[in-house]
C-alpha cells in the first residue's frame, strides 16, 4: 500500500469513527433527557460521563480528519494545531494537568464504580492501565504553547514560526493522536460498562431508555441545509481554496523577511536591541511581525471555513461551526479588541503607530478602516458565548456538560454566521491592503537607511582588512580572518538588499 492509499484508508477509518461517535453522543444526550436522576443515579452519572468522553473524542477526531483531508499546507497545519488544542482541553476535562487535583472525571468514575458495587478486577486493571497512560502522556506533554496559539493567538511571529510553521512532519502529531485515542477508548469502555451494569442492577434494559439518535440540539439538519445551499455554487469553495494558496504564500514570504531582519541584527551583533529599536529597521521588524500575525489570522479563518463546507454529518458541521465562531471572536479580539483595554493593545492600534506623519493619504485610509473595524466588534455578547463554546468543564454535578455547549451553539444561525465570517475575511483583506501600502511607504525610508548601513559596513570591513594586513604576520591566520570578514560583509549586504526588495 503506497502513501496515498494509506492516507485514503485512514480518512475512511476516521470518518467511520466520527460517524459512530456522532450517534453515540446524540443517543447519550437523549438518554440524559429521558432518565430520571433520582431513580437511577448511577446509570445517569455513567451516561453523563459517557456523553462528555465521547464529545471530547469526536471533537479531536473531526480536526484530525480535516488535517488528513487538507491539501493546502497551512490548512493542514491549522488542523493539527487544533488537534493539539482539542487534546489539551480533553485531558484537562478528564484528568487535568495539575498535581493532586481531586475534581477529575477519572476520580469521579472510580468513586461511582465503587459506590455502585460494580468494581470488578477487569475494570480495576483497566483503570490502572488508564492511570499509567495518563501519567506518561501528561509527563511528556509540551503542547501548551500550541494550544494557547490555537485558541487565543499570540503577538510573536517567532512563536508562530516555531509552533506552527515548523509543522512539516505529520508523524509526531499522528502518534500523539494515536496515544490520546487509546486513552479515550479505554475511558469509553469503562463508562459504557458502568452504564450497562447500572441498568442491570436497576432491572432496566435498553428498551426502557431512549436509543434514538436525533436531538433537539442538532436534530433539524440546519447545518446540512446551509452547507447544501452554500455548495450549490462552486464560488465559495473555489474562492476559499484560492485565497488559502495566495495568503499562505504571502504569510511565508512575510515570515521570511522577518527572519532576514533577525539575521541582519545577529551579524551586526545587536539582535537584543532589535525589538526596542525605533530606527527604520526596528520599525520594519515590528511591522512585519504585525503583518505576519494578520495573515496568520486570515489563514485560520479560511481553513476552518473550508472544513465547515466539507462536513459530512450534522454534529460534525456543528462542531466545525463552533470552531469558526471561536476563531472569529479570537481574531477580532486580537486585531481590534471588544473593550477599550483590548483595543489599546490590539494589532490595529500598533499598526496605526507606524503611519508616517508625512503621509496624509494613509491617515485618511486609517480613519476609514477604524470605522469598519469598530463596527465589527459591536456585539459584546459574543465573547460570553465564546467562553461557553470553548471550555468543557468537569464538575461532580455536571460530569457531561455537553448539552449546555450544544444549546449555546444551537442559538446561532449557520448561514448568518457563515456570511459574518466571510465579511470578516473581506475586512482582513482591507487591513492587509492597508499594510501593503504602509510597508511601501516605510520601505522608502528603509532603503535610504540601508544605503547608510552599507557604507558603514564597507568602511568597517575595509578598516579591518587594513589592520589584518598590517598586524597579522601568520599567512594562514591572515587568510582565515580576511575570508571571514569578506563572507560576513557579503552576507550582511545580501540581507540588507533582500529586506528592502522582499514584500
What are these regions (language model features)?
Residues 145-152, 384-387, 391:
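Long, charged low-complexity segments
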Amino acid at each position: 500500500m503506497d502513501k496515498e492509499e494509506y492516507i485514503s484508508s485512514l480518512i475512511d477509518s476516521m470518518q467511520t469513527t466520527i460517524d459512530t461517535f456522532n450517534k453515540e453522543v446524540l443517543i447519550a444526550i437523549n438518554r440524559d433527557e429521558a432518565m430520571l436522576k433520582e431513580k437511577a443515579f448511577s446509570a445517569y452519572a455513567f451516561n453523563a460521563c459517557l456523553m462528555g468522553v465521547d464529545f471530547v473524542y469526536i471533537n479531536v477526531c473531526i480536526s484530525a480528519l480535516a488535517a488528513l483531508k487538507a491539501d493546502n499546507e497551512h490548512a493542514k497545519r491549522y488542523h493539527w494545531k487544533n488537534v493539539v488544542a482539542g487534546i489539551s482541553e480533553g485531558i484537562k476535562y478528564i484528568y487535568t494537568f495539575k498535581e493532586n487535583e481531586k475534581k477529575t472525571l477519572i476520580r469521579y468514575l472510580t468513586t461511582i464504580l465503587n459506590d455502585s458495587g460494580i468494581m470488578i478486577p477487569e475494570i480495576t486493571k483497566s483503570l490502572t492501565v488508564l492511570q499509567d497512560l495518563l501519567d506518561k502522556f501528561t509527563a511528556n506533554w509540551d503542547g501548551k504553547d500550541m494550544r494557547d496559539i490555537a485558541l487565543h493567538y499570540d503577538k510573536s511571529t517567532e512563536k508562530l514560526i516555531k509552533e506552527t510553521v515548523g509543522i512539516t512532519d505529520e508523524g509526531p502529531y499522528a502518534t500523539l493522536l494515536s496515544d490520546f485515542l487509546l486513552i479515550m477508548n479505554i475511558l469509553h469502555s469503562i463508562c459504557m460498562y458502568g452504564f450497562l451494569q447500572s441498568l442491570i442492577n436497576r432491572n432496566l434494559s435498553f428498551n426502557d431508555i431512549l436509543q434514538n439518535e436525533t436531538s433537539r440540539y442538532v436534530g433539524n439538519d440546519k447545518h446540512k441545509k446551509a452547507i447544501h445551499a452554500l455548495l450549490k455554487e462552486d464560488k465559495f469553495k473555489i474562492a476559499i481554496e484560492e485565497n488559502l494558496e495566495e495568503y499562505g504564500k504571502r504569510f511565508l514570504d512575510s515570515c521570511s523577511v522577518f527572519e532576514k531582519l533577525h539575521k541582519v541584527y545577529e551579524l551586526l551583533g545587536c539582535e537584543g536591541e532589535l525589538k526596542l529599536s525605533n530606527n527604520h529597521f526596528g520599525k520594519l521588524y515590528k511591522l512585519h511581525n504585525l503583518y505576519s500575525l494578520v495573515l496568520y489570522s486570515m489563514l485560520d479563518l479560511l481553513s476552518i471555513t473550508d472544513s465547515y463546507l466539507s462536513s459530512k454529518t450534522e454534529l460534525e458541521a456543528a462542531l466545525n461551526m463552533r470552531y469558526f465562531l471561536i476563531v472569529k471572536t479570537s481574531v477580532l479580539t486580537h486585531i481590534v479588541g471588544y473593550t477599550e483595554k483590548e483595543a489599546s493593545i490590539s494589532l490595529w492600534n500598533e499598526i496605526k503607530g507606524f503611519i508616517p506623519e508625512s503621509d496624509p493619504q494613509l491617515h485618511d485610509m486609517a480613519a476609514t478602516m477604524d470605522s469598519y473595524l469598530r463596527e465589527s466588534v459591536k456585539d459584546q455578547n459574543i465573547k460570553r458565548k465564546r467562553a461557553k463554546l470553548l471550555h468543557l468543564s468537569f464538575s461532580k454535578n455536571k460530569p457531561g456538560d455537553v448539552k449546555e455547549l450544544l444549546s449555546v451553539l444551537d442559538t446561532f444561525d449557520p448561514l448568518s454566521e457563515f456570511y459574518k465570517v466571510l465579511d470578516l475575511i473581506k475586512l482582513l483583506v482591507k487591513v492587509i491592503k492597508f499594510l501593503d501600502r504602509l510597508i511601501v511607504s516605510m520601505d522608502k525610508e528603509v532603503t535610504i537607511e540601508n544605503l547608510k548601513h552599507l557604507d558603514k559596513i564597507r568602511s568597517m570591513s575595509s578598516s579591518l582588512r587594513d589592520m589584518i594586513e598590517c598586524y597579522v604576520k601568520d599567512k594562514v591566520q591572515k587568510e582565515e580572518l580576511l575570508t571571514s570578514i569578506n563572507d560576513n560583509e557579503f552576507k550582511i549586504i545580501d540581507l540588507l538588499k533582500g529586506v528592502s526588495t522582499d514584500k
